[in-house]
């Protein structure tokens, strides 16, 4: 037998032995992945966290230990393969997750659907979409970084959609790791009723395993890749701490769970099952967060985390999902969807993500009720369009596996469906049922964009059409004033990634201009109007009169526009009111102070007048235009700017310089904290003052400082900033400055 043959057969034997050992350890074969399970044996989970907390590495380990992939690769690995879930070339190159990726796997005969989401604030809509359709989540925290800005954002998103979660403190192997500090931050910053259900046996380079406080056992991860799990007694030097932490766990649980609370007050002994049942009840009700520990990179703590997903996170039947039946002139009627996997109720599904695949548009959906089979017809509740299902697929990152049917609780994808993110699909178009859509934040940064070569215009148009459809936070428009094409998004990185994708995926290199902030204009106080639009010069004319008031909305609603019809009687016929609203919303697209959109304003239509022949919807729309111009002249206006939450981490010796630079950029310091030679400062800074900060921070901290920022709210500009914005706008329009204009008059 030749050496090559021997090597090959040896390799096959090794692989077979590896797979046999997988089977012995309770791992599953690939043939079982697509089996349909009863509802108790399904989990839909997301893995979310701040950037660089180890989400994708953790997902890679989960897929390996469950037998879904045969070998592991690192996010920035030396083998240049990259993690399974980072399928986009750009993700592997940058070592960050840009799109949420879906997969499914099997652990202890339970089907787990997993969505790995980005941690960078610029891709926050990906997290938003994932959490909307999931039943539970794993919140990954870095044992060194702790609770960071994007952790707080993800926490708010989980609260918005009522998603129960487990916390996993990762990276115990890193220098400076301190899981106890992370737990105290979870309690103080995130207001979680949280406690350890595991403790680390050593940290940094001494990380040997974990202590399970529920079972009161030590767990060690041995063999290649930590696949052999060994249970042992708790080390002697950790027994006192383990007892104290177990007591702390029981106290926190007793405060949140009535059943366990009664046992605690009666001082009755607890069994392992009592604690597990209380953990499950409180976790599903979001009254307690179990905290697990480990290091995904060093293969410790992942299998117990999978057990916790099964033990403590809900199955689709334990989560209440609501549909809304629209009724004319009434509030929508709430309907609880039936999660049973028997197919008795009509199909209801929600499209939560669109993607252009190799075979056309791919639409990710979650089935909430009923069953969907190949060949069925479904209807889009928003457009009422019929779609015939030619192909059903389940996804494993960028690979697809065909299935014949999907049931309530499944996450799947369809091809060639014309829809938008957040659309509801049903098999019965007559019931007018729709589900709550997905919250989409407003873009805060704009940049001019143009293709480098005019011959690439077609590809440029295709890329823009695809990306704006896939990502609701990526907007595209043409500015007639400066004759420029603009794109807007959640940050500079967001827009840079799309520019790079245009070049890579469409062969269309583009040039991005300087970032522009999405300012807004709003009223300072109420302003009344009484406007008559009259145009009569033979034949049918135009006549419309509107009376009312425009007033500012509260600061918490300053990104919204409201229209209220307060008319009584027939002075303004009801069929013309939509014309008034349309005119108001058209004028709100561009203010007269600085050319930015209006927001934070309520338009109250109170009275008016019409002509029996000459009045029309168009006339009332033009009257609305005139009324708003009148308010621009008579009202008091101010400019709003986006305020960012900024978090800077750097060595202690640079604290003075960092805080000085933030103050110089009109920042308000909201808090600081320090740990072992490093400090973190939290501040609120106007986005307009944050451009170029990355370079300044690098130079002032010898390259050791790093920062993250996320959108917080809109707030009024400083007077000198407002004057500067108004002056720049007037110069760009070729208008004289106000004082010069007065001299001419």
UniProtKB/Swiss-Prot annotation:
GO terms for cellular component: mitochondrion; nucleus. The keyword Transcription regulation does not apply. InterPro entries: EFG_II, EFG_III, EFG_III/V, EFG_IV, EFG_V, EFG_V-like, EFTu-like_2, G_TR_CS. It holds the Pfam family EFG_C. One of its GO terms (biological process) is mitochondrial translational elongation. Residues 40-317 form the tr-type G domain. Its main location: mitochondrion. Keywords: Elongation factor, GTP-binding, Mitochondrion, Nucleotide-binding, Protein biosynthesis. Pathway: Protein biosynthesis; polypeptide chain elongation. GTP binds at residues 49-56, 116-120, 170-173. The keyword RNA-binding does not apply. It is found in: Mitochondrion. One of its GO terms (molecular function) is GTPase activity. Mitochondrial GTPase that catalyzes the GTP-dependent ribosomal translocation step during translation elongation. During this step, the ribosome changes from the pre-translocational (PRE) to the post-translocational (POST) state as the newly formed A-site-bound peptidyl-tRNA and P-site-bound deacylated tRNA move to the P and E sites, respectively. Catalyzes the coordinated movement of the two tRNA molecules, the mRNA and conformational changes in the ribosome. This protein may be expected to contain an N-terminal transit peptide but none has been predicted. Belongs to the TRAFAC class translation factor GTPase superfamily. Classic translation factor GTPase family. EF-G/EF-2 subfamily. NCBIfam families: EF-G (TIGR00484), PRK12740.1-5 (NF009381), small_GTP (TIGR00231). HAMAP family: EF_G_EF_2_B. This is Elongation factor G, mitochondrial. It comes from Drosophila yakuba.
């Amino acid at each position: 037998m030749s050496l090559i043959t021997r090597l090959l057969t040896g390799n096959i034997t090794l692989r077979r032995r590896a797979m046999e050992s997988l089977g012995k350890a309770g791992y599953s074969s690939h043939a079982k992945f697509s089996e349909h399970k009863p509802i108790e044996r399904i989990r839909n989970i997301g893995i979310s966290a701040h950037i660089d907390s180890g989400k994708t590495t953790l997902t890679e380990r989960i897929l390996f230990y469950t037998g879904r992939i045969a070998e592991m690769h690192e996010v920035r690995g030396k083998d240049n393969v990259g993690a399974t879930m980072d399928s986009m070339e750009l993700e592997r190159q940058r070592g960050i997750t840009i799109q949420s990726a879906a997969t499914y796997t099997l652990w202890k005969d339970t089907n787990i659907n997993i969505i790995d989401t980005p941690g960078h604030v610029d891709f926050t809509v990906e997290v938003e979409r994932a959490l909307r359709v999931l039943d539970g989540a794993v919140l990954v925290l870095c044992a060194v970084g702790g609770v960071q800005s994007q952790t707080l954002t993800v926490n708010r998103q989980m609260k918005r959609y009522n998603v129960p979660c487990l916390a996993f403190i990762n990276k115990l192997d890193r220098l400076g790791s301190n899981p106890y500090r992370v737990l105290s931050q979870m309690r103080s910053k995130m207001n979680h009723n949280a406690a350890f259900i595991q403790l680390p046996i050593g940290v940094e380079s001494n990380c040997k395993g974990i202590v399970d406080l529920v079972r009161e056992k030590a767990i060690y991860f041995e063999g290649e890749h930590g696949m052999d799990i060994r249970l042992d007694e708790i080390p002697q030097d950790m027994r006192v701490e383990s007892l104290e932490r177990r007591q702390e766990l029981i106290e926190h649980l007793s405060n949140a769970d009535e059943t366990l609370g009664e046992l605690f007050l009666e001082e009755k002994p607890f069994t392992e099952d009592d604690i597990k049942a209380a953990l499950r009840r409180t976790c599903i009700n979001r009254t307690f967060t179990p905290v697990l520990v480990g290091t995904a990179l060093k293969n410790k703590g992942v299998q117990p985390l999978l057990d916790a997903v099964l033990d403590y996170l809900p199955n689709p039947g334990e989560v209440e999902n609501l549909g809304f039946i629209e009724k004319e002139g009434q509030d929508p009627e709430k309907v609880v969807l039936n999660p049973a996997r028997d197919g008795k109720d009509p199909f209801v599904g929600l499209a939560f993500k669109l993607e252009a695949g190799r075979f056309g548009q791919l639409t990710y959906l979650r089935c909430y009720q009923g069953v969907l089979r190949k060949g069925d017809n479904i209807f889009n509740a928003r457009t009422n369009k019929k779609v015939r299902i030619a192909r059903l697929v389940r996804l494993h990152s960028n690979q697809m596996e065909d299935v014949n049917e999907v049931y309530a609780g499944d996450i799947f994808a369809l091809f060639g469906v014309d829809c938008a993110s957040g659309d509801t699909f049903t098999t019965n178009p007559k019931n007018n049922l729709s589900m709550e859509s997905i919250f989409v934040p407003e873009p805060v940064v704009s940049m001019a964009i143009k293709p480098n070569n005019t011959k690439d215009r077609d590809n440029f148009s295709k890329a823009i059409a695809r990306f704006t459809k896939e990502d609701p936070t990526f907007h595209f428009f043409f500015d007639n004033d400066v004759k420029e094409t603009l794109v807007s998004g959640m940050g500079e990185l967001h827009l840079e990634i799309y520019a790079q994708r245009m070049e890579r995926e469409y062969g269309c290199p583009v040039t991005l201009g300087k970032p522009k902030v999405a300012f807004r204009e709003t009223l300072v106080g109420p302003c009344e109007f009484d406007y008559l639009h009259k145009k009569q010069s033979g034949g049918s004319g135009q006549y419309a009169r509107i009376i009312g008031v425009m007033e500012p909305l509260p600061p918490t609603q300053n990104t919204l526009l409201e229209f209220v019809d307060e008319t009584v009687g027939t002075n303004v016929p009801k069929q013309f009111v939509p014309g008034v609203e349309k005119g108001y919303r058209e004028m709100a697209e561009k203010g007269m102070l600085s050319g930015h959109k209006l927001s934070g304003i309520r338009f109250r239509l109170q009275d008016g007048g019409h002509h029996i022949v000459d009045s029309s919807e168009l006339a009332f729309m033009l009257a609305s235009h005139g009324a708003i111009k009148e308010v621009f002249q008579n009202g008091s206006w101010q400019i709003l700017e986006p305020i960012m939450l900024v978090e800077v981490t750097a060595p202690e010796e640079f604290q003075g310089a960092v805080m000085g630079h933030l103050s110089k950029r009109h920042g308000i310091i909201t808090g600081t904290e320090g740990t072992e030679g490093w400090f973190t400062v939290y501040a609120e800074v106007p986005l307009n003052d944050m451009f170029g900060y990355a370079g300044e921070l690098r130079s002032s901290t010898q390259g050791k400082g790093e920062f993250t920022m996320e959108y917080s709210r809109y707030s009024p500009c400083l007077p000198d900033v407002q004057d500067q914005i108004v002056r720049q706008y007037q110069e760009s329009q070729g208008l004289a400055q106000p004082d010069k204009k007065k001299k001419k008059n």
